[in-house]
Amino acid sequence: MARKLSKNVKNAKAQVNKTDVFSLLEAIELAKKISFAKFDESLDIAINLNLDTRKSDQQLRGAVALPHGTGKNVKVLVATDEVSAQKAAKDAGADYVYTAAELPEVLNQDKYDFDVIVADPKMMLVLGKYGKKLGPKGLMPNPKTGTVTTNPAKAVEELKKGKANYRADKGGIIHASVGKKSMDSQKLVENAETLIQTIKRLKPTTVKGTYVLNITVSTSMGPSIKVKID
């Protein structure tokens, strides 16, 4: 199996010239064309930025609503003690709604059946105790991604419609999924453009010189394909 996978990866890479640069649509269509996985891979984008993430004002992190969703059914857990907020969250499509008293039993489990936690600010006292467990899994709620909020129902609606979370790593590169391979290419382009334009608008004032260094797209298991920067 490993040999077959290695061969597939080599074949996919052989179809991409590292020096070639494509329009966003061309890059996405090529990524889909050379995909060899038998499952519906994510279509990922990597945006390399001229950032010094040691500086607090250059640590980009947030979430953006994608016009055509992510193609993924996101399971959302809402944490709140407010009865009205609990009902509103359920009506909005939350998969799980728990109070502060109920959270420990859920969070102490080895495996979780949810992708995102949306929390009322008051719940952070409880959730903070599980930071070492939730943080590495990317599950700790954060105001910058809209997952710490006094309006959990609205956050649930946005997550269910499809939001892309983004965060610059230590090297200043933002990795995000903008949809699934099975989605229409033009819709994937519009999703990717939404993220790119959002990142451009968030350029820190302290950044000097070229801001966006390069952009690549790929499927989950495919090679990176360079995109022209406008």
UniProtKB/Swiss-Prot annotation:
Which biological processes are named by the entry's GO terms? regulation of translation; translation
One GO MF annotation is: structural constituent of ribosome
Q: Which domain of life is it from?
A: Bacteria
* Swiss-Prot/TrEMBL keywords: Repressor, Ribonucleoprotein, Ribosomal protein, RNA-binding, rRNA-binding, Translation regulation, tRNA-binding
Entry's PROSITE patterns? Answer: RIBOSOMAL_L1
- A single Gene Ontology CC term: large ribosomal subunit
One Pfam annotation reads Ribosomal_L1
Functionally, this protein is described as follows: Binds directly to 23S rRNA. The L1 stalk is quite mobile in the ribosome, and is involved in E site tRNA release.
Tell me which HAMAP family the record gives: Ribosomal_uL1_B
Q: Which protein family is it in? A: Belongs to the universal ribosomal protein uL1 family.
Q: Tell me how this protein assembles.
A: Part of the 50S ribosomal subunit.
Identify this protein by name: Large ribosomal subunit protein uL1
What organism is listed for this UniProt entry? Metamycoplasma arthritidis (strain 158L3-1)
